[in-house]
């Protein structure tokens, strides 16, 4: 991240802020979408986070920490705006099984759907750690710093998220295959 660009944005330069947003918005949106699992909600949360970033930017003490600081604001916005007791919708698919050549493809779809359901079932704090570590590529120390939590907490959240995903994936492999006309 260009330190000069962050400094200019901190001083109220709207063009500099627009350039910062251009540089980080795709990554921030990807994080929000992966945490929330809802593209529309992710867009709304991103917009709210960008407004907060603009308002709080003059108070940013260290321009080199802009990205981590922006991630922190975004994740907090995800926590605040996520529907607390929402029941996640399930994707409905009709899966053909009469063709042997489709078997591997069906298994891949089934595996992906199992992981998606399991991921949606994770608490938001575990999803945030998982996404920041595995999708953004932050180290666990960086994840802890971004989220403002101890390193050990980041490690345990990642451990429990990974364990839950692995259990759900393994449980899905024990289910019988769906026949054509059945709903996934």
Language-model-detected regions and their locations in the chain:
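DNA-recognition helix of helix-turn-helix
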Residues: 68, 75-79, 126, 141, ...
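A short pre-motif secondary-structure segment
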Residues: 129-133
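Sigma70-family region 2
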Residues: 10-11, 34-37, 50-65, 84-88
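A short, charge-rich alpha-helical start-of-domain segment used by transcription regulators
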Residues: 6-30, 127
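Structural recognition of an alpha-helix C-terminal capping motif at a helix-to-coil junction
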Residues: 30, 44-51, 55, 64-76
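Amphipathic, Lys/Arg- and hydrophobic-enriched alpha-helical face
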Residues: 21-39, 56, 119, 171
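Internal acidic/polar
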Residues: 2, 80, 88-112, 139, ...
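Arg/Lys-rich amphipathic alpha helix in sigma70-family domain 2
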Residues: 55-62, 72-93, 108, 160, ...
């Amino acid at each position: 991240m260009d330190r000069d660009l962050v400094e200019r944005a901190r001083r109220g330069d709207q063009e500099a802020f627009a350039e910062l947003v251009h540089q980080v918005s795709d990554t921030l949106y990807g994080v929000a979408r992966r945490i929330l699992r809802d593209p529309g909600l992710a867009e709304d949360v991103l917009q709210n986070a960008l407004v907060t970033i603009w308002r709080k930017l003059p108070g940013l003490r260290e321009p080199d920490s802009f990205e981590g600081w922006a991630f922190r604001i975004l994740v907090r916005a995800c926590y605040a705006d996520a529907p607390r007791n929402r029941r996640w919708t399930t994707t409905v698919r009709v899966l053909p099984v009469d063709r042997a050549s489709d078997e591997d493809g069906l298994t891949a779809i089934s595996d992906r759907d199992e992981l998606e359901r399991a991921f949606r079932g994770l608490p938001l704090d575990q999803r945030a750690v998982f996404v920041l570590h595995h999708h953004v590529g932050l180290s666990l120390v960086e994840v802890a710093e971004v989220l403002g939590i101890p390193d050990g907490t980041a490690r345990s959240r990642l451990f429990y998220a990974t364990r839950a995903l692995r259990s759900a994936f393994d449980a899905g492999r024990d289910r019988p295959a769906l026949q054509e006309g059945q709903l996934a």
